[in-house]
């Protein structure tokens, strides 16, 4: 009986007191820890959010979680509050952002779209003229009084012959070349240079 009583009493004495404090400690830790954590989080959240709101000028949005800057809400009223005269004197480039001037800037944007095709054309024309002149008739491009049948090489050869043979043989074909090239005043040096 003593053994049974001791066995029965030992688990009761050792088990009950040990079980109750453990449960109490666990419950106390969990509940107190949660309360402390929630309190700390709330304090930290308030302390962290309030200075941020004050420093960065943030305003709470429609939802408590979302935060949007006050600058976005102030942009439109600011641009509409200040008259155009005050801004023109202080900030010349700022009125371009106003909606009244955006309508005037739209044709400029359309023009800007048309400008890029015009940009490469002058160099393209120059390249086309340079590549076309040696092969095509030079009389139309450079000379006014020449005929289209004579090529640039012929004009160059005639001019070269006139310089060499004009003094010794004026009645040779070189002389005729001299008469033809008399009207080519601007062509002969250019053809010789090329």
Curated annotation (Swiss-Prot):
Positions of region (Disordered): 1-72, 113-194
Compositional bias segments (type: Polar residues): 146-171
Feature: compositional bias, Basic and acidic residues: 26-39
Protein name per UniProt: Putative uncharacterized protein FLJ32790
